[in-house]
Amino acid sequence: MATEPAAPNDQQAASNGDWLSLWKPEDPVFWASTGSRIAWRTLLLTTISLVLSFSTWFLLSALAVNLTGIGVKFAEDPKDNDRLLFWLVAMPGLAGGTLRVIHTFMIPLFGTRKVITVSTLLKLIPCVGIAWAVMTPGTPYWIYMVLALLLGMGGGDFSSYMPSTSLFFPKRLQGTALGIQAGIGNFGVSLTQFVTPWIIGLAAFAAVTGGPQGLKTPTGEQSVWLQNAALWCVPLLIIIGAVCWMQLRSVPIKASFREQLDIFKDKHTWFCTITYVMTFGSFSGFAAAFPMLIKSLYGGFGPDSPKPLAYAFLGPLIGSTVRVLFGFVADKTGGAILTQLAGIGMIGICVAMAATGVLAPTSLETFPLFVWLMLGMFFFTGVGNASTFRQYPLIFAHNPRQGAQVLGWTGAVAAYGPFLFSAAIGETLGWTSQDGGVKSALPFFIAAAAFYLFAVAINWYYYSRNGCERPS
C-alpha cells in the first residue's frame, strides 16, 4: 500500500537558515506536520514587531499635544503654531505611505527574515532622535520634521508584514491570520497614546537622559520627562529585532521587480486601493489627528477643557479590537457585505457630526457626543479593515503572489491617511477660524462622506451585488 511521503520537518524546510526549501500551505499533510507550526510562530513574532511599528509611527500624535506646554513653539501666533503641529503629525504618514510603496516589493526580493529584522532595528534611529530633540531646548522645526519623516519607517513596513503573512497561511485561514496581525498591530496606536501620559510622569530613564521639563497646563505646572515617550520602546525594539533574526524564515516565492509590476495592469488593484483608503486610510488618519483635533476644537474652554490623551487612545483601541474580532466574522460571512455596511456606517457618522454641530463647538456641551461619534467612526473603520483584507486574497485568488502584493500596495496608499487627514484638518481649522471665526472641521467631514459614498458604490458594483464581477 502506497503511503504519502513524509513532509519535511522544521529544520529540513529551512535547510539554508533563511529561505524555506519547500512551502505548500494548501497541502493538508504538509500543513499539519510542518507548515502550521512555522506559520503561527512567524505570525507571533511579526505581530509583536508590528505593534512596535505602529507605536513608533504614531509617536508624534501623542507627543505633539504636549510640545507647546514645555515651551516648544514653532510660531508666535497660536493658530499658526497649531497648524505647524498638525503638519508635524502629518509627516510620519507621508513617509509611511511612500515607504510602503517600496515595502510592497521587498518580501519577494529579500524574504521575511531580512526585511522584518532590519526594519525593526531601523526604528531605533527616530526614537532616539525624538528623545534628543525634546531634551534639547531650541531644536529647530526642520529637525523635528526630519525626525517625523523617519518615524514613517514604523508605518512603511506594514506593507511587508501583510504580504509575508498571506504567503504563510492557506486561503481558508488568511482572513483570520491577517485580521489577527493587523488588528493586534493596530493596538500599537492606542499603546503609544495610552502609555505616553503615564510614562512621561516617571523618571524611568533619568539616569541616562537627565532632568525633567516643566509642562504648563490650565491648572498649573508639573514636571515631565517627555523624552520617555520615545524611549520606552527602544529596548523592546532591540530584543524583538534579535529574536526575529534568529527565528524567522522566508517563503520561497521570488519575483523580480519588473515581474511584480503586473498588479497595476489589473483594474481591481485600483478598486481595492479605493476601498482600503476608505477603511484603513480613515483609521490611521483619524488616529493621528484625533488628539490634536480634540485640543483644537475643545481645548480653549479654560481649566475644564478635556485632556486629549485621556480620550484619544480609545478610538484606535476600539478600531483595533473590532478588526481582530471581525476577521473571524468576515471568514464566515464574506468580506464584501461587511465592507458595504462599514462604509454606510462611516457616511452616517459624518452626517450625524454635520447635523449636531460637534465640529464647530461654542462650548463643552457637545464634547461627549463628539467623542461618541468619533468612537463610532473608529468602530466602522475596524469592521472595514477586517473585511477588506478578507476580500483581497479572494479577488486575486487566481494569483496568490499578486494577491499578497495587492495587500501591500493598498496598505501603502492607505498609509497616507495620517498625512492627508492631519494636514487637511489642520488647514481646514485654520481657514475657518480666519478673521475671528469659529474653528470648524465640517468641510473636511463633508468631503470625507463624499469619498466614502464613491468607495461604497465601487464595492457594491464589483464585489457585493448579485452577478458582480468578483464576489468576495
Model-derived features: positions:
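C-terminal membrane-cytosol helix-exit motif in multi-pass small-molecule transporters
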Residues: 201, 232-253, 455-463
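Central cavity-lining transmembrane alpha-helices of secondary-active solute carriers
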Residues: 86-105, 313-326
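Glycine-rich segments within core transmembrane alpha-helices of 12-TM secondary carriers
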Residues: 155, 175-201, 410-422
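Extracytoplasmic gate region of multi-pass secondary transporters
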Residues: 60-65, 266-321, 385, 389-390
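A late C-terminal transmembrane helix in Major Facilitator Superfamily
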Residues: 189, 399-434
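Cytoplasmic membrane-interface "Motif A"-like loop-to-helix N-cap segments
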Residues: 108-120, 331-346
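Hydrophobic core of transmembrane alpha-helices in multi-pass small-molecule transporters
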Residues: 126, 140-156, 365-385
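C-terminal ends and interior cores of transmembrane alpha-helices
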Residues: 121-137, 344-365
